[in-house]
Amino acid sequence: MSSIPEGLKYSAEHEWIAEAGAAGTVRVGITDFAQDALGDVVYVDLPEVGTEVTAGTAVGEVESTKSVSDIYAPVSGTVAAVNDELDGEPGLVNSAPYEGGWLFEITLADEAQLEGLMDAEGYASHTS
């Protein structure tokens, strides 16, 4: 059974979204369900800081021993930060998907777009 923390938002593409330190900025990662399906992550390709992203579009890739999967922007905005730790340790996506394995942060174009994402209960239904 995969972990689905309360207090986060979730996309249908298996990304989680959490409020980051700065107002109007969110942190994004892939869910425990997604990392489990991928298998051992060996490489992560992330968008560059400053890149404008649109919700639902591919912005990077996660490569595992099983496959290569797109990472989708769950919200629209500007990439504010990326997790450089993943360059040397991509397995953090597997071992700590909600902590050290986060992918990038986005400064939101509009905070109202968070309302269209799932809560933990909705995501649990989506993955069952």
Swiss-Prot record:
Its cofactor is (R)-lipoate. Belongs to the GcvH family. This is Glycine cleavage system H protein. It holds the Pfam family GCV_H. Binds 1 lipoyl cofactor covalently. Keywords: Lipoyl. The gene is gcvH. GO terms for biological process: glycine decarboxylation via glycine cleavage system. It comes from Micrococcus luteus (strain ATCC 4698 / DSM 20030 / JCM 1464 / CCM 169 / CCUG 5858 / IAM 1056 / NBRC 3333 / NCIMB 9278 / NCTC 2665 / VKM Ac-2230) (Micrococcus lysodeikticus).
